[in-house]
Regions:
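Short acidic/histidine-centered micro-motifs embedded in hydrophobic/aromatic stretches
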Residues: 22, 26, 80, 222-226
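Glycine-rich phosphate-binding loops that contact phosphosugars or nucleotide phosphates
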Residues: 83-212
Length: 237
């Protein structure tokens, strides 16, 4: 053990425990990728029946959802809802962009205080620096592999005192260290990992609508009335 401790110290670590933790994290970094599970799915033999693919996708989705409901995620969900804001800014880039846009698409119908940052990436620094205040909240979607620009923009918001909610699929996400609230679906190595991210999104929107009632309800009623008045309930070409 003396030889091991000398090696650990030679590598720049204070203790064997610290060395093991760093080694484990490095191993996860090397082997954690959402693309690995996709490659495995695509490489299955052509003899596999379509119904088997359907069943396997459902089974993986169920496992992902079971892993989502942890005491930590439950408490962090509550903490996210408790954050009050003048404006809710949404950020998601690359593989996280669809989630950010979906949140805006649904929530803005009943909650008009949403500002989307994901469409004009060239000006995202400007909007954070000029428009946001500590009374706002930044909701960040950042799934692995994390986009550098997302991390830098989130760090800028953090330095400006903007509270941050992070929705991610792995605890390896660098923003875990600075986010005020972290909901980690732990689904990075699952082909159905986005299922959990969508469920978190739906839950956040549902609770947001409930807590902003009756304003949220009135906004939905206004939309329904406008659609009825203009004959748009049954869409025409």
């Amino acid at each position: 053990s003396t030889t091991v401790m000398r090696l650990v110290q030679l590598l720049g670590f204070d203790s064997y425990t610290t060395f093991k933790k760093a080694l484990a994290q490095e191993s996860l970094l090397k082997n954690t990728t959402p693309y690995r599970s996709l490659r495995q799915e695509f490489s299955r033999t052509s003899e596999t029946a379509s119904r088997d693919t359907f069943h396997m996708a459902i089974a993986d989705g169920i496992q992902v959802l079971e892993n989502l409901c942890t005491p930590s995620n439950i408490s962090q969900f509550e903490a996210a809802i408790q954050l009050e804001s003048d404006q809710l800014y949404i950020l998601g880039m690359r593989s996280s962009k669809a989630l950010a846009l979906y949140f805006e698409y649904v929530a803005e119908r009943f909650y008009p205080h949403i500002r989307q940052l994901s469409r004009e990436e060239e000006f995202v620094y400007d909007r954070i620096a000029i428009n946001t205040t500590p009374k706002d909240v930044l909701l960040v979607y950042s799934v692995w592999p994390c986009t550098k620009k997302t991390i830098r923009v989130a760090e800028l918001a953090h330095n400006l005192g903007i509270p941050m909610i992070l929705i991610t699929n792995t605890s390896l996400n660098p923003l875990v260290k600075i986010a005020d609230v972290v909901i980690d679906t732990n689904s990075v190595n699952h082909p159905s990992g986005d299922t959990a991210l969508m469920l978190v999104t739906e839950a956040l929107m549902s609770e947001l609508g409930r807590r902003t009632a009756p304003e949220s309800t009135k906004n939905i009623e206004k939309i329904e009335q406008a659609l009825n008045d203009n004959g748009l309930i049954l869409w025409e070409n």
